Amino acid sequence: MEKAMQKEQRKLPEDTWCNPLVLENYPIGFLAPGRVGKNSGSMANFNGPARDFRELGDPEVLYDDGRWYLFPSVGEAYVSTDLVNWKYEKIKFANGEKLGYAPTIVKCRGKYLLSSSWPFAGKTEILQAFEPLGPYHSLGEPVDGEGKCLAPEWIDPMLFCDDDGRLYAYWHFGGTGEGIFGIELNPDNPIQGIGKPVKLLDFNPENQFECFGDFNEHSDMAWIEGESMFKHNGEYYLQYSACGTQFRAYTVGVGRSKSPLGPFVIQKTPVAREKYGRVCGTGHGSWVKGPDGSVWQFYTSLTRRIHMFERRIGMDRVKFDVNGDAHVQITAVPQSVGGGGLGILPVSVFKKSLASSAAGCCYSGFAFDDCTHTWWMPDDIDEHPWIEVDLLQDFDIYAFQVIWAEEGVDITQGILPEPAKYKLEFFSGNDEKKLVAVWNFYDNDRDLLIDFRSMDMVRARYVRLSYLPSVNPGLKRGVNNLTVFGKR
C-alpha cells in the first residue's frame, strides 16, 4: 500500500529512506591497491588507473531483540532500530579473527554463528559468540560427516537455523558446472557435518537470467553465487544470484522446496532485477523478517565507477503472490518503511546544469544523469566548488540525495575519506532568481559517501550544491549523482 502525501504536507514521514542506503564510514574495498598492492592480478578490473575505492555489498541481516544487524562485505556491521538510521559498529573478535567477503550471521540455540568466504578471511572457519557483535572466537573449519573438509571451496557461505533448531550450511564454488551445495551441521558442534554435502543448484541456461553477461548473452556460461536461505509458510526459499556482480543485469533468483536440502524448483522469473539507474545490478543479498511479519530483501547495488566490484547496498519489500512466488520491486525514490511509496519523484534527472568548473571531461551534466559510473569533478584549482541544476519549473521539493565521487584516496599515504561540508541553496523565478531557502550542512561530522536528507518542503526551480574543499588536499571530491525529489 502506498502512503500518498497530501498536498498540504510539508515534510516526509520520519521513517523515510531512499536507496542506496545511507551507511557511514564506507570501507576501502578488499581489492583496492592500498590493501593488496598494485601488482595484484585484480588491477585489470579497474576503470582507468588502479586506485583505492570504497565498497559495501553482499548484505546479510539479522533481526534480533528489536534491532537489525547488517553484516556486509568489507565492512564491520551496521545496527538499526528502525531500518532508516544505521549506526556503524565494530565487530569484536577474541583472537584476531577476521571476516572476508559475504559474511553470514545466524542465531541458533541462543548462540550467534558467523562465517564468511575464505578469500580475505584467510581461512575457512565458523565463529561463535553470545552477542551479535561478539566477541567471536573460532570453532575451527567445518567438515562433513566423515571428517573431510567441505569441498568445493567455502565461498558465500550461508548458515541457517530451522524452526526445530537444526542447523544447515550452504556455499558455492565458481562458475559453470560447480553450483551451490548444502549440508546439515550439528548445532551443538557447528563445525561437524552430518552426512555428505549435497549439490542443490547449478546453472540452467533455460533460465536466461542466469546466463553470464549484461545482456545474458553467454548462453553456455554462468556464475551462480550469493546463496541465502529463508523459510516462508513452511517452504524453503534458497536465494541465489546470477550473471556476474559486475553487470547491470546481476539479479536474484530463488529455488523453492519442502526440505532445506531440496530438491529445489527454480522460480522462472527473477525475484529482484533492475538494469538501469542509480540502483541497478541488484543481486547478492538476503531476506529478513521484521516484527510485523514483513519480509525485506537486502541486496547489492552496482556502482563500478572505479572498480568492477565497487558496490552499494539497498533494501526493498518482498511480496509473495498467491502461488508463493516472491517478487521485489526495486526502488530509487523515497519510501516509507510503514507505508511504501510517497508519490515523490526525481525532478532533476537530465535537467540543465551549471558548475563552477570541470576537471577534464567530468562535466556538470554527469551529476544529473542517474548513472552510477559517471561523475562531475571540479577543477583542481577551484577553491569554491558548486554545481547547479535548473528544474525548468517550480517544484515542491522534499528531499535530496547526494552520492559523492572521490578521487585520490590512498590509505598507504594517509589520504583518507572525510565528512563532506556542504549546503544546498534553493531559488525560484524565471528571469531573475530569488533565494528562497538554504539547507546548511557545513557542520556535518559524519563520513557519508551517500547522503539522503528530507527537510521542510521548499518550492523552487533552481538547486545549487556548494561544498568546502577537502581538508587533505590530496582528496578530490566531486558528485556522482545529485538527485532532487519533489512533485508539482
Residue ranges and their predicted role:
Residues 171, 299, 463-467:
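Extracellular beta-strand-rich recognition modules
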Residues 369-435, 449-488:
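Aromatic, loop-rich ligand-recognition surfaces of beta-strand-rich domains
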